[in-house]
A protein has these predicted regions:
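GST-like domain detector, emphasizing the conserved glutathione-binding G-site
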Residues: 1-75, 79-82, 177-195
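Residue-level signal for nonpolar/aromatic packing positions in well-ordered secondary structure
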Residues: 16, 41, 88, 107, ...
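A contiguous, mid-protein "functional segment" used to position or interact
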Residues: 116, 120-166
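Solvent-exposed, charged/polar functional surfaces in cytosolic regulatory/catalytic domains
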Residues: 23, 80-83, 87-91, 136
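Acidic/histidine-enriched, glycine/proline-rich intrinsically disordered or flexible terminal extensions
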Residues: 150-195
Length: 195
């Protein structure tokens, strides 16, 4: 929740980003003054809020936190996350950023989920345009500062890969998890097809 006045609060990342850009980005460094680009940015923010975030969140739940491994849930939400990041990958094949060829609130809204993609059971390397975008956004000094507040977390793609290298027990557990996800997909006939 973001409280920006003594009597008004805003929740959800989409509403917070919209408020911040309306009130603190008059030069449109992260937002747009063109109506079509404003609509495109809102579209990608809503798409993340209603699609990628909930589906990847469910993939995290079924793959990581559920008391019992339920094959249908694992393949359903991992597969849906793959489908959705495939849409991002397609958008980024001919664009450096999601809207208007500049880093914007649309990228900010989607970055956090992509930053934790591997933790969700989806391999970022399978989506080369998305991976290149993630690397561009991750290289921004302000993004690095933001990721370190309060401290760098263990779920980002870079931290995940480092832990795979450094912790053999973790790597073994991850290989087993990937095998369970693969088996669940096979059990239910899931086949990824790029958009």
């Amino acid at each position: 929740m973001f409280t920006y006045a003594t009597t008004v609060s805003t929740l959800t990342s989409t509403a917070i980003l919209a408020y911040l850009t309306r009130h603190y980005d008059p030069e449109h460094k992260f937002s747009f003054d063109d109506d079509l680009d404003v609509s495109r940015a809102e579209q990608w923010m809503a798409w993340q809020h209603g699609g990628l975030g909930p589906m990847q969140g469910q993939a995290n739940h079924f793959n990581r936190f559920a008391k019992e491994r339920i094959a249908y849930g694992m393949q359903r939400y991992t597969g849906e996350t793959e489908r959705l990041v495939g849409i991002l990958d397609k958008q980024l094949k001919s664009n450096d950023y999601l809207v208007g060829n500049k880093y914007s609130i649309a990228d900010i809204a989607n970055f956090g989920w992509v930053h934790m993609l591997r933790f969700s059971g989806v391999e970022l390397d399978d989506f080369p345009s998305l991976k290149a975008w993630w690397e561009r956004v991750l290289a921004r000094p302000a993004v690095q500062r933001g990721l370190s507040i309060p401290s760098k977390g263990p779920f980002g793609n870079d931290a995940y890969l480092q832990r795979l290298k450094d912790d053999e027990e973790f790597a073994k557990t991850e290989r087993e998890l990937r095998e369970k996800i693969k088996a669940a997909k096979e059990q239910y006939g899931y086949k990824y097809s790029s958009p």
